[in-house]
Amino acid sequence: MRDVMDLYAPFVGRTLSGEELDQAREILAAQGFSHTLGIVYDEVSIDKVVAHLDVRPELCQPMGIVHGGVYTSLVEDVASLAAWWWLGGRGLAVGSSNSTDFLRPVTEGRLIATATPLHRGRTQQIWVVDIVRKDGKRAAQGKLRVANLPMGTPDDE
């Protein structure tokens, strides 16, 4: 984990654009589960993170619509990055609660996720993530509660 955080260090806490955003995308794309889902980051700042993923058959459940776990994972990924980005390297942002509502079915196309802060405090943050489909209609909405932990927090005590 420390290696990944060191890679992010030059970028954290700032709005990224151009070449910096491309460099950060390369780092983010290398992250295991995010890479498996195909999450691509389009905008990263301390007040908003936007990402997308293209729907493909392996992300769908047997009825042919996007699996609920994809939405939940997208909420977790985008909001976690947003929370950590806002901390600006002052600690770790660790998800503690994820509540995602599935509103409309999606069978194909692109999902766009936008994370914005509802609350940012000393010990916790809450981020709302709206996920829209290609026609602009909301497909899902999630809320991630994040614990702000000091750097070097042990896994268990």
Segments from the language model and where they lie:
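Terminal targeting signals and extreme-terminal segments of soluble enzymes
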Residues: 1-157
